[in-house]
Amino acid sequence: MKFAVVVFPGSNCDVDMYHAISDELGEEVEYVWHDVDCLDDFDAILLPGGFSYGDYLRSGAIARFSNVMKAIKKAADEGKPILGVCNGFQILLEAGLLPGAMRRNNTLTFICRPIKLRVENNETMFTSQYEQGEVITIPIAHGEGNYYCDEQTLQQLIANNQIVFRYEGENPNGSLFNIAGIVNEKGNVLGMMPHPERAVHELLGGADGLKLFQSIVTYWRDAHVVTT
């Protein structure tokens, strides 16, 4: 399986994402600069965290116009796994690949620490290796992680089981309905504020994020490997 880590000007979690795939999964991975217009050679697309284009205007607001976004939308339409983490989630929202928007944390501060999450849906290509309702610990690092959508959209997310992760116990940023991560209706585009790539080895303080990447590989192998 071949992963692409998309790098925008201002990305700063791309190396973490790369090593999570290369070192912990043992899968092929390449950095892809934001000006490419084709991602056909890749099986999964990863949008890492950071401050794309300095987060001017809004987080992700300029990155949505990058050349690579056309290729990302095409990959999403083809059903390939697309994962946006932190700033990557914000970019997916700005690009319309996921519903809703991000606001500043209700504390008006940057928050960087481990946080508890509950797995609300383990039937996606990103969460099959988790137990339903499993509580995991994943780091967060953001100043604009306060997810918001209108009431109609929230009810659709609930009805369609698109809410994948919710903050457990403490809501660190004021996010609506404790939402930490959602998928699109098709289930192949996941956006989440916590950083699973920073939780893939016990030496990093925990490995709860590794199952997310293992889930992607499991999905791909089940879909593409022919058993004889």
UniProtKB/Swiss-Prot annotation:
Gene behind this protein: purQ
Domain of life of the native organism: Bacteria
GO biological process: 'de novo' IMP biosynthetic process
EC annotation from Swiss-Prot or TrEMBL: 6.3.5.3, 3.5.1.2
Domain Glutamine amidotransferase type-1: 3-226
Residues the record marks as active site: C86, H195, E197
Subunit structure: Part of the FGAM synthase complex composed of 1 PurL, 1 PurQ and 2 PurS subunits.
Function: Part of the phosphoribosylformylglycinamidine synthase complex involved in the purines biosynthetic pathway. Catalyzes the ATP-dependent conversion of formylglycinamide ribonucleotide (FGAR) and glutamine to yield formylglycinamidine ribonucleotide (FGAM) and glutamate. The FGAM synthase complex is composed of three subunits. PurQ produces an ammonia molecule by converting glutamine to glutamate. PurL transfers the ammonia molecule to FGAR to form FGAM in an ATP-dependent manner.
Pathway: Purine metabolism; IMP biosynthesis via de novo pathway; 5-amino-1-(5-phospho-D-ribosyl)imidazole from N(2)-formyl-N(1)-(5-phospho-D-ribosyl)glycinamide: step 1/2
Intrachain S-S bonds: none
Catalytic reaction list: N(2)-formyl-N(1)-(5-phospho-beta-D-ribosyl)glycinamide + L-glutamine + ATP + H2O = 2-formamido-N(1)-(5-O-phospho-beta-D-ribosyl)acetamidine + L-glutamate + ADP + phosphate + H(+); L-glutamine + H2O = L-glutamate + NH4(+)
GO MF entries: ATP binding; glutaminase activity; phosphoribosylformylglycinamidine synthase activity
Alphabetical keyword list: ATP-binding, Cytoplasm, Glutamine amidotransferase, Hydrolase, Ligase, Nucleotide-binding, Purine biosynthesis
PROSITE patterns: GATASE_TYPE_1
UniProt name for this protein: Phosphoribosylformylglycinamidine synthase subunit PurQ
Pfam families: GATase_5
GO cellular component, one term: cytoplasm
Cell compartment(s), UniProt: Cytoplasm
InterPro entries (UniProt xref): Class_I_gatase-like, PRibForGlyAmidine_synth_PurQ
